[in-house]
Swiss-Prot record:
Gene for this chain: GOLGA6L7
Keyword Coiled coil appears in the UniProt entry: yes
Protein name: Golgin subfamily A member 6-like protein 7
Gene Ontology CC annotation, any one: cis-Golgi network
InterPro entries assigned: GM130_C, GOLGA6L
Length: 622
């Protein structure tokens, strides 16, 4: 702005000097030049018109004044034309300066936009690198989740296999329990039959006792009665002991069976609870698998979005690279334009220097003209010499005018070229402004896209944070479930060991029950054999008792007592089932002497049955 003001002041000063010079020239120099010309003309044509003193006549003066007026008018017109040219040049200079400032501001704005664009590109590159790093972390987390999912699948398969094995073992235990229950029922049925047989035998023994009591026993047989009573008491005690032992065995066996059934029920309950827990765990694992699948779907969508964003970022980088190339070209063009402007400024400076030199010459000429006018006003006598000098000066002025015309033509050509260049520059600047507007629009859209991408990235980061929190919770749940499954495995292993131990015990008890059943069966068989033997012995005893035991001189021959063999037979039938005891059954004794029973001898035949061995019954006579 200061340079423009100084230039305007200089131009105003030069214009003022030109006007003053032309006014002074029209007043003095022009008249002198015309007078000299007229003098020359008159001097050559009519020498009588001159006076003796060398002065002009009034007519010459009037002609000179008219010529001076015409020359003054022509010089004034020429001065106005020069002034207009100077004003046009000044206007063009101001336009060029304004364009220069506009170009400088546009260049500065373009440099700022390029700097901002470069910063945005660096920021985008940093965000892209961060997004790549985040995508890598997501990929690693996804691979870890897939590995964890595979481990969970393997663990679930192992648990399902163990559950199937446990269910099979439970089914086997249930089957064995059913078999044991059936065998226990059979044994209880057999025991019930044995107890019924035992009760029948006891009833039969009681009937025999009743018959023995109803029988008439002679008084002298005190020893036999006492022995019989002792035997009965012993038999009763043995029967009571056997009943107590049998009842105790049955009670213990029933308690064992009840305990086993209770244990089996508890085991079934525990297995049902474990199956329920396994089902709940499977449901949880299924839910976790569903969540994992949803998370994988979300991760896949996020990867797709990241891929799209990377594609957009790559396109934006390509656009930025193209824009940078365009900006480089524009900077080159701006550099060329600046170079042209510098050249134009140099030319303008040269032109100003030439104008300054011309002004100095004009000042010198004005000074010279002033001195000449002063000399012409003071010395009219030296007019002829001065006319020659003025002719030379006019020649110089003509040459200067020719130079000025040439300079004006050069300035017009230069101004035309500059106007063309300025038109081209304005067209280029307009195009650049349009491109910059498009670039600004693209940058605005890119900034909006980047804002949306940042919002999406922020949401994705929040989602990933939530997913990481869920994954951490799931890992904790998986750890707890693994611990629970480990505890359950340990419990199942212990239960399997307990079941195996119980199964072994059940098998041992089953074998013992089989042995007891075999013993009972053998006892029943032995009882049956004993009954048969007792029947045979009764027959043999009847045969033997039908004959006299002593000589007939001492005992009567009539031994056919009606109640003599019935107690023995009944005693044989009601023989006790215990093979470890020996029961003695006594037949009713004979007469005390032969006088009471005249049919018998002096001594009676009293047979006693006792068990000597396990399989033999001996008979002695008293």
């Amino acid at each position: 702005m200061m340079s423009e003001k100084t230039q305007q002041r200089k131009l105003a000063g030069t214009k003022k000097k030109f006007t003053d010079y032309h006014q002074w020239n029209s007043a003095g120099v022009g008249t002198g030049a015309t007078d000299t010309k007229k003098k020359k003309i008159n001097h050559g044509a009519n020498p009588e018109t001159t006076t003796s003193g060398g002065c002009h006549s009034p007519e010459d003066k009037q002609q000179n004044r008219a010529q001076l007026k015409e020359e003054n008018k022509a010089s004034h017109q020429h001065q106005q034309a020069l002034r207009r040219q100077l004003e046009a040049q000044d206007h063009t200079i101001r336009i060029l300066m304004c364009q220069k400032t506009e170009l400088e501001t546009a260049l500065h704005d373009s440099q700022d936009a390029a700097r901002k664009f470069e910063e945005d590109s660096k920021d985008l590159a940093a965000r892209l690198h961060h997004s790549w790093h985040f995508a890598g972390e997501l990929q690693r987390a996804l691979s870890a989740m897939s590995a964890e999912h595979e481990r969970a699948d393997k663990y679930i398969k192992e648990l399902t296999k163990e559950r199937e094995a446990m269910s099979l073992e439970l089914f086997r235990n249930i089957i064995t329990n059913k078999e044991l229950k059936e065998k226990n029922a059979e044994l209880q049925e057999k025991l019930r039959l044995v107890e019924t047989e035992k009760s029948e035998i006891q009833l039969h023994i009681k009937e025999l006792k009743r018959k023995l009591e109803t029988d008439k026993i002679p008084l002298p047989q005190v020893q036999t009665n006492t022995l019989q009573e002792k035997m009965w008491r012993q038999e009763e005690e043995l029967r009571d002991q056997e009943e107590l032992r049998d009842q105790e065995k049955l009670r213990k066996h029933e308690e064992k069976m009840w305990r086993q059934e209770q244990r089996l029920r508890d085991q079934e309950k525990e297995l049902r609870e474990q199956e329920q827990q396994m089902q709940e765990q499977e449901e949880q694992m299924r839910k976790q698998e569903e969540q994992m699948r949803k998370q994988e779907e979300q991760m896949r969508k996020q990867e797709e979005q990241m891929r799209k964003q990377e594609e957009q970022m790559r396109k934006q980088e390509e656009q930025m690279r193209k824009q940078e190339e365009q900006m480089g070209k524009q900077e080159e063009q701006m550099g060329e334009q600046e170079e042209q402007m510098r050249k134009q400024e140099k030319q303008m400076l040269k032109q100003k220097e030439q104008m300054r030199k011309q002004e100095e010459q004009m000042w010198k000429q004005e000074e010279q003209i002033g001195e000449q006018e002063e000399q012409m006003r003071k010395q009219e006598e030296q007019m002829w010499k001065q006319e020659e000098q003025i002719g030379e000066q006019e020649e110089q002025m003509r040459k200067q005018e020719e130079q000025m015309w040439k300079q004006e033509e050069q300035m017009g050509e230069q101004m035309r070229k500059q106007e063309e260049q300025m038109g081209e520059q304005e067209e280029q600047i307009r195009k650049q402004e349009e491109q910059m507007g498009e670039q600004e629009e693209q940058m605005r859209k890119q900034e909006e896209q980047m804002g949306e991408q940042e919002e999406q990235m922020r949401k994705q980061e929040e989602q990933m944070g939530e997913q990481e929190e869920q994954m951490r919770k799931q890992e904790e749940q998986m750890g707890e479930q693994e611990e629970q499954m480990g505890e359950q495995e340990e419990q199942m292993r212990k239960q399997v060991e307990r079941l195996q131990f119980k199964e072994e015990r059940l098998w041992d008890e089953y074998e013992k029950m089989q042995e007891e059943e075999e013993k009972i069966r053998r006892q029943v068989e032995k009882r049956r054999e004993k009954k048969e033997r007792m029947g045979e012995q009764e027959k043999t005893q009847e045969e033997r008792c039908s004959e006299p035991c002593l000589p007939p001189s001492k005992y009567p021959s009539d031994m056919s007592h009606p109640g003599s063999l019935e107690p023995a037979r009944e005693a044989g039938k009601g023989y006790s089932h215990d093979n470890r005891t020996a029961q003695i059954m006594q037949l009713p004794p004979g007469m005390k002497n032969a006088q009471e029973r005249p049919g018998l001898g002096s001594t009676s035949c009293i047979p006693f049955f006792y068990g000597g061995d396990k399989k033999k019954i001996k008979i002695i006579s008293i």
